[in-house]
C-alpha cells in the first residue's frame, strides 16, 4: 500500500526530514510539484501545514439514499467512526429520485441536512442516470465518482451477510465473466428467468448454494456490485461491510427501532398514521425535520403526468425503443395495460410479470417520465460514467475533505449550477441537464401539491451545516 503526502508549504527539506524522523520512511519525489510516495502498510492521506506539523486523515465513503435517514443509517455512521476509526465521512447520495423508481419522500437538501446533523461531513449528489439505474449501473456510477475524487480510503456499506470474503468471491466471478458463468446466465434467461434468478442459477455452477443464495438479498446485491466496480477500476479504495441490523430492506413493520426506510415511508403515507411513532425510528433531529417540513412526495403524485407522457408517446407512434433500459416486450406491456391506467403504483402492479419485477417497471416508467435515453446511458458508460461532483452540503470537518479533493480530484466539484452549465459539454453536459430536469420536475410537483412556487435550484449554492 501507499501513503500519499501533499505538501504545499515552504522549507521542503526541513519538513521532509521531520517526516522521516517521525515516520521512519524515506521520501522519494514522484513529481516536481507536491506529491510524494512513502512505503507503508496502510493507505493514509497525510497533510502538512506550513509549519511542518503532520496531520493525517482517514476518509471513509458511504453510498446512500437516506429516504429518509433513520436509525440504521445512524448506526452505520457511528460504526465507521468507532470501529473503522475514520476521521471524516463523505456520502454520495441520490438526488430527488431513487433506485426503486420512486421520488424521494423529502428533497435532497433536507436529506443532506439530516445526514450532516448525524455524522456525515460532506454530501455529494449521485447523478440521476445512476440513482435511477440498475444495481450494477448505480454502483458503477457511484464508485466512479468516489474513485475520481482521489482521497477516499474506504467504501463502507451494509450487507445482510456481513461476510466481505464471500461477497468478494462472488464479485470476482461476476467481474471476470467466465465462459461457464456467461453460458449459464444466457441459458436461464432464455428459459424466461429474470436477470436476478438467471444470475443465481449461473453462479450455482461455480459456487456453493450457500454463497450463490447471497445474491437474493438486496443489500448483498448492492454490496457485490460495489466490490465488482472497485475491482474493475483496480481502485485503491478498500471495501468494508457491516452486517445489517434490525428489519430487512423490504420489511414494512415498525415493530423494531431499526425499521427499514421502506417501512417508514409506508407508514408516513398512511393519512391516519400517528407520526409520534416515528420518534423511535429516526434520530431526534430527523424527526424534527420531518415534522417541520411535511411536504412529502410519493410515486402516485406523478400519476397524471406519467399518464399524459405515455398516451402522448404512443399516440405519436413512439415505441419507446430509445428510452433508457427499455425493451420491446416491456413497451408492449405498457401499451397493453394503458387502457386500465388508474395510478402510477397500480400501473406497476398491473404490468408486473414473473420475470419483470415491480421495481424494474417503476424505474422504466421514471425513465420515460424524465426523458432518459439509452444513447445517453451508453455515452456515459463509454466515457467512464462521471464528469463532475455536485456538492449538496458540508460541515466544518468537511472543509478539510473539500480541500483535499480540490488538490487531487480529476473532476470538478461545484456548488452552483450556472457555473457548471458554462463549463461542461458533450456527455457531461447531457448528464447535468438530466439532473436539472429531474429536480425541476420534482420541485414542480411539490409546488403543485402544496400550493407554492417551486424551489429554484439555480439560486441555491450549498447546504452547510
Give residue ranges: language-model regions:
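Methionine residue identity
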Residues: 1-2, 16, 53
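A glycine-rich helix N-cap at a beta->alpha junction
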Residues: 117-127
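N-terminal catalytic cores of NTP/NDP-binding nucleotidyl/phosphoryl-transfer enzymes
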Residues: 54-111
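Active-site cores that bind ATP or allylic diphosphates and position pyrophosphate for catalysis
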Residues: 126-465
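Compositionally biased, intrinsically disordered low-complexity segments enriched in Pro/Arg/Gln/His
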Residues: 29-32
Amino acid at each position: 500500500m501507499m501513503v500519499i503526502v501533499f505538501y504545499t508549504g515552504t522549507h521542503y527539506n526541513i519538513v521532509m526530514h521531520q517526516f522521516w524522523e517521525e515516520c521512519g520512511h524515506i521520501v522519494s519525489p514522484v513529481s516536481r510539484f507536491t506529491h510524494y510516495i512513502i512505503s507503508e502498510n496502510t493507505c493514509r492521506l497525510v497533510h502538512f501545514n506550513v509549519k511542518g506539523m503532520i496531520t493525517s486523515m482517514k476518509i471513509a465513503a458511504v453510498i446512500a439514499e437516506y429516504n429518509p435517514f433513520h436509525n440504521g443509517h445512524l448506526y452505520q455512521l457511528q460504526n465507521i467512526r468507532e470501529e473503522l476509526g475514520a476521521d471524516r465521512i463523505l456520502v454520495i447520495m441520490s438526488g430527488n429520485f431513487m433506485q426503486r423508481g420512486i421520488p424521494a419522500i423529502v428533497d435532497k437538501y433536507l436529506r443532506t441536512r439530516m445526514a450532516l446533523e448525524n455524522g456525515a461531513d460532506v454530501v455529494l449528489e449521485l447523478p440521476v442516470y445512476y440513482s435511477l439505474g440498475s444495481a450494477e449501473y448505480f454502483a458503477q456510477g457511484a464508485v466512479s465518482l468516489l474513485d475520481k475524487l482521489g482521497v477516499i480510503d474506504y467504501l463502507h456499506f451494509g450487507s445482510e451477510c456481513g461476510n466481505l470474503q464471500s461477497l468478494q468471491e462472488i464479485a470476482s466471478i461476476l467481474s471476470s465473466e467466465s465462459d461457464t458463468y456467461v453460458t449459464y446466465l444466457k441459458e436461464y434467461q432464455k428459459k424466461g428467468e429474470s436477470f436476478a434468478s438467471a444470475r443465481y442459477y449461473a453462479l450455482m455452477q461455480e459456487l456453493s448454494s450457500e454463497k450463490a443464495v447471497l445474491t437474493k438479498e438486496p443489500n448483498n446485491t448492492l454490496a457485490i456490485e460495489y466490490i465488482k466496480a472497485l475491482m474493475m477500476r483496480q481502485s485503491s479504495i478498500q471495501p468494508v461491510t457491516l452486517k445489517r441490523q434490525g428489519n430487512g430492506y423490504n420489511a414494512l413493520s415498525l415493530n423494531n427501532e431499526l425499521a427499514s426506510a421502506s417501512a417508514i415511508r409506508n407508514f408516513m403515507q398512511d393519512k391516519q398514521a400517528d407520526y409520534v411513532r416515528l420518534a423511535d425510528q429516526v434520530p431526534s433531529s430527523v424527526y424534527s425535520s420531518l415534522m417541520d417540513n411535511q411536504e412529502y412526495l410519493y410515486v402516485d403524485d406523478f400519476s397524471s403526468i406519467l399518464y399524459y407522457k405515455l398516451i402522448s408517446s404512443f399516440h405519436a407512434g413512439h415505441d419507446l425503443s430509445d428510452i433508457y433500459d427499455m425493451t420491446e416486450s416491456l413497451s408492449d406491456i405498457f401499451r397493453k395495460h394503458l387502457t386500465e391506467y388508474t395510478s402510477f403504483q397500480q400501473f406497476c402492479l398491473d404490468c408486473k410479470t414473473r420475470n419483470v419485477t415491480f421495481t424494474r417497471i417503476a424505474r422504466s416508467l421514471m425513465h420515460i417520465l424524465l426523458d432518459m435515453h439509452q444513447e445517453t446511458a451508453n455515452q456515459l458508460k463509454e466515457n467512464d460514467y462521471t464528469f463532475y461532483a455536485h456538492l449538496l452540503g458540508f460541515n466544518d470537518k468537511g472543509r478539510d475533505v473539500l480541500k483535499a479533493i480540490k488538490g487531487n480530484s480529476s473532476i470538478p466539484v461545484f456548488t452552483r449550477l450556472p457555473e457548471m452549465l458554462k463549463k461542461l459539454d458533450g456527455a457531461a453536459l447531457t448528464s447535468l441537464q438530466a439532473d436539472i430536469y429531474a429536480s425541476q420536475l420534482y420541485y414542480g410537483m411539490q409546488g403543485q401539491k402544496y400550493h407554492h412556487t417551486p424551489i429554484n435550484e439555480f439560486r441555491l449554492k450549498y447546504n452547510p451545516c
